[in-house]
Amino acid sequence: MQKSWRNIAIALAGMTQCARQVEELAKTGYLKTEVFETAVKSLINTDPSSAEDVFGGLDAVQPGLSTLKDILEDHRSPGNADILRYVLGAVVLQKRLARRKDVLYIIGNRLEKVSQQVEHFGCSHDNVVSNIADIYTDTISKFPYRIQVTGEFNYLQQERVAAQIRSLLFAAIRAATLWRQAGGTRWHMLFYRSKMLAATEQLLQRA
């Protein structure tokens, strides 16, 4: 993976897109099907040709690019607090996951079965969502650190919503892997926001 601000911005857009959908789903119960399908496809795309190919092209991460632009312009906005927390949580979990080759092996094998399910049922089918959520529960959820999702209890207690949230968090961690491969570090978020903003704005003009 080529290290560049462009690829870092694409990966961050993937993370923020998933994080924003988690926030919206947890608080309103509303799921954007196209955003969710992009997340699922990123999990089963094992041989992408580029950073944007992970998500199916720049158009697929346009919502994430817009959210990322808003955050980079005003990262202290209370409205972005949960989104930032989920993004940072995905970064933490990705780093821990990268150290566990045994867990990565299990995830890889089980995602192959998800890929076969997607071919038969599509990305949003209950069987697919449940399977992805189970992988997350059986592997990443076992780590001591967990992402605490806040929202409306009536939505969070619904099994389908909980499974969708786990699937989206899983995809955010996948995007965090891409972010690391592109050269992303947490220092960038603190000291290089102007460079990331410029790259994000250029990508939005093309998406």
UniProtKB/Swiss-Prot annotation:
It is a peripheral membrane protein. GO terms for cellular component: cytoplasm; plasma membrane. It is found in: Cytoplasm; Cell inner membrane. Keywords: Cell inner membrane, Cell membrane, Cytoplasm, Membrane. The keyword Iron does not apply. Gene3D superfamilies: HflD-like. SUPFAM superfamilies: YcfC-like (SSF101322). Pfam families: DUF489 (PF04356). It comes from the Bacteria. Its main location: cytoplasm. InterPro entries: HflD, HflD-like_sf. Belongs to the HflD family. NCBIfam families: PRK00218.1-2. This is High frequency lysogenization protein HflD homolog. It comes from Teredinibacter turnerae (strain ATCC 39867 / T7901).
